[in-house]
Amino acid sequence: MAGNRIARNVVTEVYRETLVKSGVTIRPGDLVTLDSNLEAVLSVAASVGPKRVALENALYGESLTDNYTGGDNLKYIIPRSGDVVQLRIASSVSKGDVLRRKAAGEVDDGGSEEVIGIALEAGSSADGLIDVEIA
């Protein structure tokens, strides 16, 4: 069911922007957090707070395969509960799995970290994008 947009079924598409921290690479579909300088870094398992999801930079003709690097202007959304977005998975997941925040901006079905959402499809690629309903 993967498509060509990260925001699949979002009630309000209020886009936000911030700079990517130097030395960091962020892919569309990664979960991100903001550091003390309000620059984007990859979310880790211990991260808490808003579920910020990196978007593709469609305004510049970029797609899901075009990454942001340090100094780039990152476009992201904070989806609401019930919104459907594509997120990157850390390992294989099944449809209906409860997904949690993991390292490197990805989600997975194990552990006790903050619940991000429910997998709406199965995924087998370690770097794959799947549709997720936000919790």
Please name every model-derived segment:
Residues 1-135:
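Surface-exposed, low-hydrophobicity beta-strand/loop segments enriched in small/polar/acidic residues
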